[in-house]
């Protein structure tokens, strides 16, 4: 719970600092965080219709992958390379050293200013593979299977009881089958006499 609260405070602080106005620097101390969506087929082009692409993807009319472009507000004369984040690429999207750095995705580093981005990014670098050094570390938590129950919840223990896989059971109606052949049954016990 402490880790979650710390991460929530860090993200809200980054958003609060990012919402302050820029001080006229081309790199920018502060400035609103610019997040947009665009189609993957137009990676090489600048498109400002992110909301249209997001609404088209959300409505189900277009099932192609959408990328999120995160970074500082675009300013005159700034050349900031924005890295695309593919939504359908999974946790280890394109395993290089820059993927998964929280300070860069939130807008840390140059766009939030050297002090906040550098200090917090460097501080978090060893733990979560942050923006400034530190090797890439996988998260400690894994996705639990559908029937898994933790023995000690809240203590980050990996001992678990996994129930066997259950398949959906379908009960079919049992109906009497049609007779194979009609048997001839004589009336009035005909043919059952011994002397016949």
From Swiss-Prot:
What Pfam families does this protein map onto? Chorion_2 (PF03964)
* One cellular component term from this protein's GO annotations in UniProt: egg chorion
From the Swiss-Prot or TrEMBL record, state where the protein is found. Secreted
Which Gene Ontology terms describe the biological processes this protein takes part in? chorion-containing eggshell formation
Please indicate which superkingdom the organism of origin belongs to.
Eukaryota
Q: Where is the signal peptide?
A: 1-16
| Alphabetized UniProt keyword annotations | Secreted, Signal
Presence of the UniProt keyword Chloroplast in the record: no
InterPro entries for this protein: Chorion_2 (IPR005649)
| Function recorded in the entry | Chorion membrane (egg shell) protein; plays a role in protecting the egg from the environment.
Q: Which family does it belong to?
A: Belongs to the chorion protein S19 family.
Protein's UniProt name: Chorion protein S19
Query: What is the native source organism of this protein?
Result: Drosophila grimshawi (Hawaiian fruit fly)
